[in-house]
């Protein structure tokens, strides 16, 4: 297996089955972050992930981390918090602010480069990338964003400035996603946070089968229209 150099003149990707085992899932480098190339990548289970100063790197890890939304793990403490939550949750109200929050909230640095920000803003303008916002009064305290593929949602990043804000974003999104025909959330690579919320690892081949099937299944009409998803308990 060898790393493939992408051409700027073609948006085609090599098969994910050719990805390196170490580092796990590294498939290709180069190309660009145009909407057409990004959408082609997501349609084939591939995503960009690289640090500032590095070339664009494309990944398709094996195994793949996913969350079946009905399997979201609601801990006792989170259930108590949610029952008296002070938060309001919205959909697609403030995409730019959410991606800024994901970029700037990590003290150790971030993989979300200026180029990544601009690329996903373009995807949002085209109706493919979406945000979930969590508010305390008028303050944005958390959120997440990702890319839609029919009944599958590819989560990209989340942030939290207040207690349980990012968990609230995912909890409320899972409930709405299920209600409107959503089936699976792609978490890309498992970490302790997503594992605590119910994410698991499945073989890449299984993920690609789910992706091929689910991206052909539309959600209920107008699901992504900007709106309020959750109001705080009184």
From Swiss-Prot:
Q: Which UniProt keywords apply?
A: Acyltransferase, Cytoplasm, Transferase
Has keyword Ubl conjugation?
no
Is Acyltransferase set as a keyword in this record? yes
SUPFAM superfamilies assigned to the protein according to its UniProt record, in alphabetical order = Acyl-CoA N-acyltransferases (Nat)
- The highest taxon in the source lineage is Bacteria
Catalytic reactions of this protein: N-terminal L-lysyl-[protein] + L-leucyl-tRNA(Leu) = N-terminal L-leucyl-L-lysyl-[protein] + tRNA(Leu) + H(+); N-terminal L-arginyl-[protein] + L-leucyl-tRNA(Leu) = N-terminal L-leucyl-L-arginyl-[protein] + tRNA(Leu) + H(+); L-phenylalanyl-tRNA(Phe) + an N-terminal L-alpha-aminoacyl-[protein] = an N-terminal L-phenylalanyl-L-alpha-aminoacyl-[protein] + tRNA(Phe)
Q: Which one Pfam family would you cite for this protein? A: Leu_Phe_trans
Any one cellular component term from GO for this entry?
cytoplasm
Task: Tell me the compartments it is located in.
Answer: Cytoplasm
The molecular function terms of the Gene Ontology recorded here are: leucyl-tRNA--protein transferase activity
Similarity field: Belongs to the L/F-transferase family.
- Protein name as it appears in the record: Leucyl/phenylalanyl-tRNA--protein transferase
Which species does the entry assign this protein to?
Salmonella arizonae (strain ATCC BAA-731 / CDC346-86 / RSK2980)
């Amino acid at each position: 297996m060898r790393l493939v150099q992408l051409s700027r003149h073609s948006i085609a990707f090599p098969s994910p089955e050719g990805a390196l085992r170490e580092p796990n899932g590294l498939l290709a480098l180069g190309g660009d972050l145009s909407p057409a190339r990004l959408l082609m990548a997501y349609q084939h289970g591939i995503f960009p992930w690289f640090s500032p100063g590095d070339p664009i790197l494309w990944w398709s890890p094996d195994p793949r981390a996913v969350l079946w939304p009905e399997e979201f793990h609601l801990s006792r403490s989170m259930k108590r918090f949610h029952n008296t939550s002070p938060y309001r949750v919205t959909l697609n109200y403030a995409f730019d602010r959410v991606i800024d929050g994901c970029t700037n909230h990590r003290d150790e640095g971030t993989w979300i480069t200026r180029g990544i920000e601009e690329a996903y803003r373009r995807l949002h303008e085209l109706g493919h990338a979406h945000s979930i916002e969590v508010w305390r009064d008028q303050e944005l305290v958390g959120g997440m964003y990702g890319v839609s593929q029919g009944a599958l949602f590819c989560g990209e990043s989340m942030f939290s400035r207040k207690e349980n804000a990012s968990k609230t974003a995912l909890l409320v999104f899972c409930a709405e996603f299920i209600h409107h025909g959503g089936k699976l959330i792609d978490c890309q690579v498992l970490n302790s946070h997503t594992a605590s919320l119910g994410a698991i690892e499945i073989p890449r081949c299984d993920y690609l089968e789910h992706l091929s099937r689910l991206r052909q299944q539309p959600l209920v009409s107008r699901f992504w229209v900007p709106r309020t998803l959750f109001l705080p308990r009184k």
